[in-house]
Amino acid sequence: MRRITPLALSLGLASRVAADDGSSGTSGAVWATPHDSYSSSIGVLGCKVNTNRIAYWPNSVDCNNICVSLSYGGRTVYLLRVDQSQGAHDVSYDAWNYLYTGYSATERPTAGGAVAMDYADVDASQCADLLRTDGHKLPLSAANSMNFLASCLAQPDSWVAKNYVLYNILDSTCSWGHDEVCTIDWPAANQPTCPSTLGDPANLTSAPVYNIRYPSGQTVVASSGQVVPAQDDAKDESAAWLGMAPNLVGLVLAMTFSILGTNIHS
């Protein structure tokens, strides 16, 4: 389960209000808050996914509903649900910043709190581009994801049961282990087989995970905190947004500010 950060403590109350308003359904509104440190309670490997598009929400992660859309100001992103919060509707800082401003957090970082955004549970295929594995399968830790995977394999028609891949990497920030694929002969065996020893805590440096710090927008290596240049993942959607026809951008912005003005004066 994701640890509570000072940011989550200060902003979590508003998100819990959304959770009490029926956000466990298939669509609705949530108070989205920014989160700047990748984690996964089910062992999804950050070096194999786009960590700038992750949802950290109160509901437990299940074997089917792992993808949600989040929309604000005419913009929409798809987010992987691979971790569980303790009440807040946190999303990756870059996703929050892009939805709120139209810019990546590495380009124009913005500080702020809970923002009302529209969400919907969507088919997992909508998050395929966020999975950096062959066949867009969910990358799981062979050593530390078996409880979750076993629960999904017990549901053979579930999305995860049909779309997973195991790696001999121990932690979600890919600091320990071997970057190699493992297999499991389920249900005959309950332990994966890997080319190297399963769970070997070798120092892994070839597959770093990056975080974007709140509110500075600096990109850092998750395992060490070392500041590095911004990665391409954080720029793609904001570039697409800015590439829209100027009149369309203007129309969307005008509508957004009109709605904000109405809310302020009502």
Language-model features: where?
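Mature exported/compartmentalized surface modules and terminal targeting/interaction regions
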Residues: 2-3, 12-60, 64-66, 77, ...
